Every structure is written in C-alpha cells, then in structure tokens.
Regions:
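Aromatic-lined substrate-binding rim segments of carbohydrate-active enzymes
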Residues: 1, 304-307, 313-355, 400, ...
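The substrate-binding groove and active-site-proximal loops of carbohydrate-active enzymes
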Residues: 51-57, 157-158, 256-257, 285-298, ...
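Alpha-helical scaffolding within the catalytic cores
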Residues: 263-270, 325-326, 350, 357-368, ...
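Secreted/periplasmic carbohydrate-active enzymes, especially glycoside hydrolases
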Residues: 1-290, 294-314, 518, 528-534
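Substrate-binding clefts and catalytic carboxylate motifs of secreted carbohydrate-active enzymes
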Residues: 49, 56-63, 70, 75-76, ...
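Short, solvent-exposed turn/loop segments enriched in Gly/Ser/Thr/Pro and often Arg
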Residues: 14-16, 40, 187-194, 284-288, ...
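Active-site region of glycoside hydrolase catalytic domains
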Residues: 79, 83, 97-98, 105, ...
Length: 543
C-alpha cells in the first residue's frame, strides 16, 4: 500500500471448476435433472445450473454481487462479534447479554485497551491486553460485567406475534488516550429461541424435549447426533421418500437447557418457540433472491412487505441461495423467521461437494457474518437428505461452537419433520385435510401460473399462446405423476372446473382462481390441526 500515490485493487474472478451443462427443458425431452456437476464445487449457487423452477444461468452467477469494502484500521481490531440475548424465561422483564468477540493485535508489542459494549442505555466496560500478534477470544457475561443486564427490554417477535424492535448496539475498543481504535456496529433484536422436539437415548424410548440452545450449548458441544438417528414408526400421512427420523440425544435429560415435557399430540415434530411462545410457522421457500443477483434493498423490500402482508412469519432460504446482508436485515425488520439451509441438495440425487473442509470454512464464515440477526431461527445442513457422516459431524461441531443460540438440524424434511411435497395439483382440495396436513413441513405446493402481464415480461408475444416449448423452457412442468405430467394435471383441473381457454389472458385469469383455491386449502388444512401435531408449513415457493 502506497499512501502517497493511487493504488490499484485487482480482483480475479475464476469460473467454477465444474460448471455443468444445463438441460434445455422442452416438451419432448422433459424437465431434465435438478442441478448437476456444479454441486461438486459447493458451496455454489447450485440452482444456477438449472432446476425444475429456473432455467440455467449462463455464467452461474459468477462475479461480485455485493459491495466490496476495504477497511483501514489500527493495530487492535475487533473480529467476528457475537451478541446473545438471554432471557430468564418464562420471565421476559429482564435480559442478560452474552458478548463474544475476537480481538487481534497486529503490532509487534503488547497492547491494552478498554472494550466498551453499548445497547439501549446499557454500557459495559472490560479491560483487555494482548501480546504481539495475538488473537484472543473474549467472552463477557453478567458474571464478569454486572452491567450486561437490561430491565424491561423491548422484545423482537415474529410477524403476527408482536413488534420487531431492533436496538442499535456497538462494541468499541478505546485506548488509554480515549482514541477509538475500532468499532463494530450492530442491530440487535432481543429474543430467545427454544424448540420442542423428540430425540432418543440409549435405553429409554423416544422422549419429548424442550430444548434451549442458549443454555445447552454454552460448552460449545452439540446436543444431538444426527448420524445416530432413529427411524420412527409413523404411517399417519403421506411422507416423501426417505421416512421420518429423530436424532440421538448427546446430553442427559434435565441437563442445562434440556427439559423433559409431556406432549403426545405433537408426536416427534419440531415446534419453534420465541420468547417462550409457540410460533405456528407459515411461509414459503425462496429458491434465489434474484436470478441475476440484483439484490439491492429497493428490489428485495417489496417481496418482504408482501410476505408480511400475507401474514407469513417464516422464509426458508433454500440451499442458502440468498447470501446478502440486506436479505437478513429485511427479515429482521419484517418479522420473518429464517430457516437457513447450507448448500447441499437431495441426498442420493445431487452430488456431494468434493472438499468438505472448504465447505465447512464457508459455513463458519456464513454463521459468523449473520448470527447476530434475530430472524435466523434454524440452521439446516441439507435440502431433502442428510450430509455424509463425515461432513455431518463437522457441521454439528462447527454450529455448536460458532452459534450457541440456535438449533441446527441435519435434514430439511425428515428430521423432526413430516416430509416435503407433494408439488402437483390436487383436484380435490379436501385431500390436504384428510391425508397430508400435520407436522412441520418444509415444502408443499402446486404448479402456479403467474398473471398474463408477468408471462409477457419473459416471453415474446408470439410465444405466449398456445403453450409451446418456450413454456417448457421456463419450467412448464413435465414431472410425471402416474400417466400424466404435473402441467397436464394442472391444466386438466382448470379446464374441468372453469372451462377450456383459447388465449393467454383467459388461461392466466382462471389460473389465479385455481392457485387461490389450492393455496388456501393448504394453509387452512394446517391451521385446522394447529398443535394437534401441526406446527408449520412452508410453500414451495413464495418468491
């Protein structure tokens, strides 16, 4: 770095080693595979090779899609701060703060300073001293700093359960000469997560637990072992492919943060709780925030407003495709809990990453970057399946160490969950009530055609009618159910209920009625069984 002249910052962008070859969907050859070789390079935007909901993105979203910042600092630096809010539940009239941060001394001599934490009128000071080139982890609780307490805090709640109050907080290093050496600014939502779920021990049968990670994970060790999972005998409803499982409990029942409870109605299914209150999760999956990674606040905020106005309270970040700070900021502001996947998809179909260590380093960086967001409620290893045993153990250890405030689950649909799907149109909407509704379901949906105005945004007018290969390129579904494809079932149902269409506008108008009927039935079916084993339902897809 030359401080007296202009400096040039060069950024080299490398293509993925395994970009794969997208399948060009058409009527004759069908929808093609979901993803492909790009999964080997994980973590990547695996859907950009093409999926059954998105054509291939030609450059696989290579390049820079967020701001790049160059920071000039002093010899003492604050690194990777984590603030945990600990409520003495069920009491919410006070909160204790747990502040963890690394501090790095890049100088060649010992340095001292005072570490200041400020939030909502609370101010705590702690002296630090670091040797030359030392990086030190500092963890402060109310035991070390009695000031790390607040009375009558304003809480953060999911949409529909209360407000989304966010405190401005800062962590500063102040020298003996009162100079500010470094400062980290954050927005903190005061809330505490708990989970009701089932697990098993060596001898007793499956047990039902109330699990509080903030209490249970302060030793930095996992509470559950997903590799030693047990399959449950639950044949109550349609379940997708791989069955239903519960994890092995690594810590004794009634140890800190793990409490035995009695609840036969919820079976083994997960219930998410915020501030001691059960949250009935309603929302949808985001496959990608934007296909071309145009991810400004101006582009994303209307989607979050829509979710809030639809009374949703959860977004699933499917395979971690939404990667920017503003996504989580908006989820904080609009009260959307986030089920955050990592970059793995369907076990037995999608390829596993070639480099587990690279994958876990990216997990570590992702968790450290976003863990202060109150909206994140759940970390998840894989969409539709389990990670390999080696990678699963690495992930579980990493999450317990890096984020002792949230649950980590090893599977999006089969672990303390009731499966995923189906994704086909149901002519008889009552089927959702009779045969499907219940549990915590990470995906369920139906083909869903947008308005004619939207169709004309991505098709030339001459291609909009009749249905042609241009429709199939844009994923007019060719998945089969029995002798018919998803798109045939959808169109047939529309024709039977509302009559055949002979132009795009009429077809899309009728589609909105069919879409409304289907999605209303899905949500009402889950609502009808709330806490009578139903705890959450996420549409495929809501964005």
């Amino acid at each position: 770095m030359d401080y007296d002249k202009k400096n040039l910052l060069a950024i080299r962008i490398l293509p993925p080693n395994n970009p794969g070859i997208p399948h060009e969907a058409n009527r004759k050859e069908g929808i093609g595979p979901n993803g492909g070789a790009l999964c080997l390079d994980g973590p990547t935007f695996i859907s950009s090779e093409g999926w059954d909901w998105i054509p291939g993105i030609r450059d696989r979203n290579m390049g820079i899609w967020q701001d790049v910042r160059v920071k000039f600092g002093n010899e003492l630096e604050i690194v990777d701060t984590h603030v945990i809010t600990d409520l003495p539940l069920p009491d919410t009239t006070s909160v204790n703060f747990i502040v963890q941060t690394e501090i790095y001394n890049s100088s060649k001599t010992t340095r001292t300073a005072n570490l200041h934490f400020n939030i909502g009128g609370v101010s705590a000071v702690y002296p630090v001293s670091l040797n030359a080139n030392e990086k030190k982890m500092i963890k402060l609780t109310s035991n070390e700093c009695k000031e790390l307490q607040m009375k009558n805090p304003r809480l953060w709640w999911p949409n529909g359960y209360g407000g989304q109050y966010l405190y401005d907080a800062s962590l500063s290093l102040i020298s003996s000469g009162k100079d500010t050496l470094d400062v980290k600014k954050m927005r903190i939502g005061i809330r505490e997560l708990e989970y009701e779920l089932s697990a098993y021990e060596d001898n007793p049968p499956i047990v039902r637990l109330n699990y509080n990670p903030t209490a249970a994970l302060q030793d930095g060790k996992p509470a559950f072992d997903t590799v030693k999972r047990k399959k449950t005998d639950n044949k109550v409803r349609y379940t997708n492919y791989d069955g239903e499982f519960v994890p092995y409990l690594l810590k004794p029942v009634s140890s800190q943060g793990i409490e035995l409870i009695k609840d036969s109605l919820m079976k083994e299914y997960m219930v998410i709780k915020v501030n001691g209150q059960r949250i009935f999760c309603k929302g949808g999956n985001w496959g990608m925030d934007d296909g071309m990674k145009r991810v400004s606040r101006e582009r994303l905020e209307p989607a979050l407003k829509l979710h809030k106005n639809m009374n949703y309270n959860m977004i699933r970040n499917w395979t971690g495709e939404s990667t920017e700070e503003v996504f989580y900021e908006l989820c904080d502001e609009y009260g959307m809990l986030v089920m955050n996947d990592f970059w793995l998809s369907t076990d037995g179909f999608n390829l596993n990453p070639l480099d587990n260590c690279l994958f876990v380093r990216n997990v570590t960086e992702t968790v450290r970057r976003f863990r202060n967001h109150p909206s994140i409620a759940l970390w998840c290893a894989r969409n539709e399946g389990f990670a390999t045993n080696e990678l699963e153990y690495m992930l579980a250890a990493t999450l317990a160490k890096e984020d002792g405030s949230r649950h980590y689950t090893g599977n999006s649909r089969s672990l303390n969950s009731s499966g995923s799907g189906p994704w086909r149109y149901q002519f008889d909407a009552g089927w959702y009530y009779r045969s499907l509704a219940g549990g915590f379901r990470s995906e369920v949906g139906t083909p869903s055609l947008p308005t004619a105005e939207t169709v004309r945004e991505f098709m030339a007018e001459e291609d909009t009618w009749p249905i042609s290969d241009v429709w199939y390129y844009h994923d007019w579904h060719n998945h089969r159910y029995g002798s018919k494809t998803f798109s045939e079932l959808y169109k047939e149902g529309m024709d039977r209920k509302l009559g055949p269409s002979d132009n795009l506008d009429d077809f899309c108008r009728k589609a909105q009625l069919i879409n409304y009927e289907s999605h209303r039935a899905i949500f009402e079916a889950w609502n009808s069984k709330m806490w009578n084993d139903a705890s959450g339902e996420l549409l495929w897809m809501s964005h």
